[in-house]
């Protein structure tokens, strides 16, 4: 896999096991599988699936949510009064993302030997989350779709700006959400 700001071909597998020790001990097992396929010289198809399983103590302090720039895009951040029982919250999840990445500006800069570029992206995300793996079902499936831009930045890889619309029950949300992040989603 190309490890720079915009991978063009190859694959990446990430596994992590995170122990949270103490009075209310738990362990998190994360898995991420990514595939990058060159479609043309300037277009890359990128696919990712990420899963999380949590073992041990589960409470609402360490709960995860869908709707940020690193999982299901197109959803606004949850409000403070959001119910933790809703379809966007849980401890265990699986989600997938598909991106079409198109380089629209690519050149080598002579200033400090840094590369410049600009990449436009179309994306579709989808996944399910729940408090327990056994309770995960397709009735809680949510998604997001949209477009974005990637601006390469030395050391940080890239600045990522995405605009998306959430999808639930085969209907798009009326309002869009803007997500700003550093690095590619995967």
Predicted regions and their residues:
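A structural signal for short secondary-structure junctions
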Residues: 90-92, 111-118, 122, 139-143, ...
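Short, contiguous acidic/charged loop-to-helix segments that flank catalytic cores in large enzymes
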Residues: 82-89, 132-140, 167-170
